[in-house]
């Protein structure tokens, strides 16, 4: 049988072959729509993700073995980064928590029942049992970002998990460790397949554009990395970050616990996270430490060495739990002091009712970043600790600065605040925070103890003083609700006839004397009447809080004993806030001494006498004095 050649059919089949080949060779890439990275189905199958781990070499040695510490890093990436040579930007999260933490057994925290200024009694030191299996460090972030065309990277911070080194809780190595990981992602640092070997591994799948995010300690680390100015870290989204360990464990010279963790201090957190360093410190003959502050001894493990060097020497000598004063130890753990090199675009998130990592932590960094001219946005919600911005905000931020898409995010509103009755994913846009229409209004006190005194915009000379008696056994909420008590002073505004919008940082000035050389000073702003029961919301009752040590009336670096009968004036900020106080409520200023939820608890009986004429409250009110006085009128 003779076959006849058909040129038309051949041409058609050839064209079809070219089309199929071109289609087969078309590579998957991220999809951007409306300024946001979209979920790409080809990236959305977890079974096809490539997961592997490695160790990145840092520039420091903090575990005493004489070798540069290596950080344990895990990578999750779409298969196309291997099969098609696709390069993608990176979303990176680092944490000290991934490999387990110590428990809260009795004696782990400092005993807060002590006299002020006394040396505290010793506490116990729990050990962490490391958890986790290679190659996975964490599964956080991956379901959000890998399908949208990102690679997700995790690392354990120094001295935790399989990362070498020592935890320092805000020390330099906790900034330099994520810096090294970013540099590896950008091709400038060495990565290894094992913690001690020489076989290298490269991040050939990375575009060299890195963003970082995380919550709480995991949110602190992005800021720490950004303060190094490392090239390639383009954007960070810290969520409820601790930006100063002094501000976390102290207030204006006062020893003050973070909310929910009474008796915690920086060394407690060190023990809580120290899951690494179980391996022997070898060779043993080289582990003898000659340090004036340490016994001349051999250490059995890296963990033992780190405990001696960091917890039992640096922290013990620097944290100063006796006075609560600010010093160089704390200054070295305050990221505000390190921001000069920072270049990363900053989107911050925090809750106004976060009494663990308080809202001042984000505001102080946001404010400085604005002054530096960095791209900045801030998202505040009305809840407690944690809580990211809406995914749309995060997506637009990373799309702009990691994918490099000009989506106009830098022209969006600078501040986004969730109003009291709105869901968290429906924030209200504002030109900035604090509200540009807010101005400071001073309020003054009139007598009323042991009941309630007055709080108004009119200053009336009374030449009167009122006295409270410290007793830590009473809670702040109980004192605020009491009709009569000599354990607090409470001054209230008239009942509001209109809503009052507070936006900014309230300030308090108190002139006081004490019958003892040391005293706690606690300030609450409250909304009255107090709401109880299931219907009470987190935005009810407590408007703001603040604490101070009257011994530090001159400076948070210097304290002096109080002379009996002598009056001292101390001025300090409360926390940033943006809250609408509803009409029908009264704003109350409560002054008391020991705060059962936050401060040390000395024996009851200390008397604080307040000069009313020389004590005042400053509130940032949207609409200023006219708005507030109008709300006071019947």
Which residues does each PLM region occupy?
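Short beta-strand/loop motif that positions the catalytic acidic residue
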Residues: 342, 348-350, 354
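C-terminal, loop-rich substrate-recognition/catalytic regions characterized by aromatic stacking residues
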Residues: 28, 35-37, 379, 388-634
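Conserved alpha/beta-hydrolase "acid-adjacent" motif
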Residues: 355-361
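Conserved alpha/beta-hydrolase
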Residues: 146-162
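Catalytic-loop region of hydrolases
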Residues: 25-115, 130, 139-141, 151, ...
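Catalytic histidine neighborhood in serine/cysteine hydrolases
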Residues: 370-386
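Catalytic nucleophile-loop/oxyanion-hole region of alpha/beta-hydrolase
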Residues: 132-135, 161-178, 189-192, 384-390
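Accessory cap/linker subdomain of secreted extracellular hydrolases
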Residues: 28, 40-43, 59-61, 68, ...
